[in-house]
Amino acid sequence: DLLHGSQFCHAGALMRRDVLEALGGYSESKDTLRVEDYDLWVRMYAAGYRGFNTQEILYSMRDDRNAISRRTFQSRINESKVILRAGKAFGFQSFSYAQACIPVLKGFCPTWLYKYLHGKRLSKK
């Protein structure tokens, strides 16, 4: 499901140091700016490592009022690039082209509409 976005909440993630070192740590490329964690998960799975989420909720997280403004158009393009790399790594290249359009389309969405839709999505969880 990494083509649909990061499946892990990075703030609470635990990982083995040797795995992080084997992957070369976080990418410092400008193409992964603001999506470094997502890129790391893709590389981790592509290298054969696995992860999981506990079923128990251990903490709550919230976005502050500036969270949406930090989601720049460039960070959405970077997310699309990671999706395309994931598609290639996992053999779903044709599907990843469609998935990679979603972050870019969100970038064209008016802020008020994005806030509304984001709130609706979160209220379903």
Name each region found by the language model.
Residues 1-74:
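Conserved nucleotide-sugar donor-binding catalytic segment
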Residues 16-17, 49-50, 82-86, 103-104:
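Secondary-structure boundary/capping motif
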